[in-house]
């Protein structure tokens, strides 16, 4: 165990933390394991050992991110660059915070951390040394230190010796803000960022993902301004060095489809694309575990072992896990270091330029085809739309689809206007000669979800080039190019109209969905570039 390793209380005092007695610096996994299972711990600090060897923790009432409690200091650094919640047509979570309120929140967190035994983890965000962030995480909770050790890139001893942080994350999960009403904030909880001080503050929420996605939001600010694409996607590479990226919102299949025994994983959630190629921001994976089974997702199941950290799962008395129990939350998760997956890119999670760009959508309306090949304008249109839909059950068992449009398949994490991400992505794609595809992993007219077997065969056809050589026909209204046949895929499902009792049924649902697309895209028409893309979308 390295305690301090040259990190002094004085360095923490520079951030406003005083009276530091004990710094546990970059703790080993073995030490974290002992700390988390310390029988004297109470409440959400306490970990429970499971039969798989991984420790499980509870994150309290926050079992997901708290977007309504996210704030960014509006000052000279950010005023003219950030995509603000109170400007323009697009709705987002980037609520402005005054420098005065920031100082108040910072005082709350530093007082919470002062006089405590602190865990400090220094790690990298970004696998490219030229553009990575050196991040210092400070917390009083052992498992939160474990979470960031899993999720970020672990520096070597040599890198730690010369580590100079670019960004500080102070996690004061145990403190809240009693003055939130007078300050015009959403609640007593807060996740706040200051780009001038290069710091994130967390108060009131124990959810580990706030640290992960907080740094993603920062990369989403810094990289596109340098012409580097910053993407909410998974990525993998084939035997010939061919790289594919998979964009998609939560639950559309990013982690599942990119974890492919035939290809090496670059990463499952956050990537950049620069002059050298595609690189992971992270050093770990954060997989959903609801209804996880060894049969359906063996790689993820086998990654849950010692050093993995489970969140909000139900652990039985005997230490076994009920993965089917979503009573705490449907968003049960596990974080693990990326090397828990066997088939990964080593030693650094990066590869060459992507030639296949896949947009995953789970269309609960049953309108979109399982796969279509996009033109350059359609690529931008569907990237900015970021569509998926969930099935929400109602009391009588009728299931109505709920549409979600999330710009760039990750609106919650965007720091700049969505068109800036689209422009950078398109430039990178054009330079690499990349082709985009829209893949529907959702439902069709039968009311059943498209099988994972068919979806995997579709992904194979995209990656091995057979889809590009297939004959296509055009789906009306959406003007999408669909292959007439693909190896290993039931031909009947390729045209979504065939899965309905009559084409009129599809037509009716298609009109509903097309209108939703058109209404959503209106917010991008306030720029000439956005207005020009309307023609690439559906037409009624």
UniProtKB/Swiss-Prot annotation:
Name of this protein: Phosphoenolpyruvate carboxykinase (ATP)
Q: Which cofactor does it need?
A: Mn(2+)
Induction comment:
Induced upon entry into stationary phase and by cyclic AMP (cAMP). Repressed by glucose (catabolite repression) and by CsrA.
User: What species is given as this protein's source?
Assistant: Escherichia coli (strain K12)
Q: What biological function has been recorded for the protein in this entry?
A: Involved in the gluconeogenesis. Catalyzes the conversion of oxaloacetate (OAA) to phosphoenolpyruvate (PEP) through direct phosphoryl transfer between the nucleoside triphosphate and OAA.
Per UniProt, the keywords (alphabetical) are: Acetylation, Allosteric enzyme, ATP-binding, Calcium, Cytoplasm, Decarboxylase, Gluconeogenesis, Lyase, Magnesium, Manganese, Metal-binding, Nucleotide-binding
The source's domain of life comes to Bacteria
Q: How is its activity regulated?
A: Allosterically activated by calcium. It may represent the only case of a monomeric, allosteric enzyme.
Which residues in this protein are found as N6-acetyllysine?
Answer: 87, 523
Catalytic activity, as annotated = oxaloacetate + ATP = phosphoenolpyruvate + ADP + CO2
Under the heading Pfam families, the entry gives: PEPCK_ATP
Listed binding positions for Ca(2+) are 149-150, 152, 283
The similarity annotation says: Belongs to the phosphoenolpyruvate carboxykinase (ATP) family.
Give the matching InterPro entries.
PEP_carboxykinase_ATP, PEP_carboxykinase_C, PEP_carboxykinase_N, PEPCK_ATP_CS
Q: Which SUPFAM superfamilies match?
A: PEP carboxykinase N-terminal domain, PEP carboxykinase-like
Q: Which GO terms describe its molecular function?
A: ATP binding; calcium ion binding; magnesium ion binding; phosphoenolpyruvate carboxykinase (ATP) activity
Q: Where does Mn(2+) bind?
A: 213, 232, 269
The pathway to which it is assigned is: Carbohydrate biosynthesis; gluconeogenesis
Q: What is its EC number?
A: 4.1.1.49
Which parts of the sequence bind ATP?
213, 232, 248-256, 297, 333, 449-450, 455
> Where is this protein found?
Cytoplasm
What residues bind substrate, as annotated?
65, 207, 213, 333
NCBIfam families attached to this UniProt entry: pckA (TIGR00224), PRK09344.1-1 (NF006819), PRK09344.1-2 (NF006820), PRK09344.1-3 (NF006821)
